[in-house]
């Protein structure tokens, strides 16, 4: 969470990182960086960034820190690690799980779970030993690579919660010093990078899902009605975060308008 300042002061020329890390500076970073339970696929995130006002908001949000936001990518829809079958929203009641502090914890608490924050190095051991029964961790393929599915045999995929935006940003003075042709090359390069990395991750996710199912692991896929219900509950938490700053309110309004436009939220 220190790279924004490091890029702004020139200690670093740029960064590729999760936008949500900076939510301590302004809650708008959380609403723009990982709107929990909002999107179903990274292409929807890209549509919001490029055509729903997201890129412009992130550029405005980062400018006071001396940082120029070039564009965004995404991790892909994160899966969910679980030792017990969680097939609907109500199944989260009483489940002790690992989730990072912030909006994710707020939403899991709202649906009746008992989230705790654990350092990254302790998550696997906590799941293995039963300290927690589930964990908000990473994409399916990353969870697979780390061995989570050997100890937690009811992963939820596609995921139902997190899809972080990855921002590619540079020092504003360095950006302003570039000629227009190099700026255009970088902007298009970021778009190409975003599409490539998310497609690669999705293909690996699907391969690992197939491999795990062949081993008898139950990969839980929530029905649309439960995903929609999770999103509607999450809106209440988004609204709370929207009241914490002017930029957060603008981020919330832009996101919810876009989600209604693509049919992921009911029209008002």
What are these regions (language model features)?
Residues 1-44, 53-268:
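N-terminal secretory/targeting leader peptides
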Residues 49-50:
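Helix-boundary and loop/linker segments of multi-pass membrane transporters
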């Amino acid at each position: 969470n220190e790279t924004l300042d490091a890029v702004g002061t020139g200690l670093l020329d740029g960064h590729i990182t999760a936008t949500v890390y900076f939510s301590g500076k302004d809650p708008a970073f959380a609403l723009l960086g990982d709107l929990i339970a909002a999107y179903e696929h990274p292409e929807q995130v890209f549509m919001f960034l490029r055509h729903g006002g997201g890129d412009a908001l992130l550029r405005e949000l980062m400018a006071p820190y001396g940082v120029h936001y070039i564009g965004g990518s995404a991790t892909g829809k994160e899966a969910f690690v679980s030792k017990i079958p969680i097939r609907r929203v109500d199944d989260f009641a009483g489940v002790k799980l690992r989730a990072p502090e912030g909006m994710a914890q707020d939403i899991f608490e709202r649906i009746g779970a008992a989230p705790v924050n654990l350092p990254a190095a302790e998550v696997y051991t906590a799941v293995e030993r039963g300290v927690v029964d589930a964990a908000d961790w990473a994409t399916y393929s990353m969870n697979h690579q780390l061995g989570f599915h050997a100890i937690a045999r009811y992963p939820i995929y596609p995921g139902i919660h997190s899809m972080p935006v990855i921002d590619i940003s540079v020092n504003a003075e360095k950006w302003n010093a570039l000629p227009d042709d190099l700026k255009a090359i970088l902007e298009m390069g970021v778009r190409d990078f975003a599409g490539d990395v998310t497609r690669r991750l999705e293909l690996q996710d699907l391969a690992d899902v197939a491999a795990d199912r062949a081993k008898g692991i139950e990969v839980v896929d929530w029905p649309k009605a439960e995903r929609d219900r999770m999103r509607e509950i999450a809106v209440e938490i988004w609204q709370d975060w929207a009241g914490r700053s002017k930029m957060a309110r603008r981020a919330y309004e832009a996101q919810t308008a876009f989600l209604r436009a693509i049919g992921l939220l009911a029209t008002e």
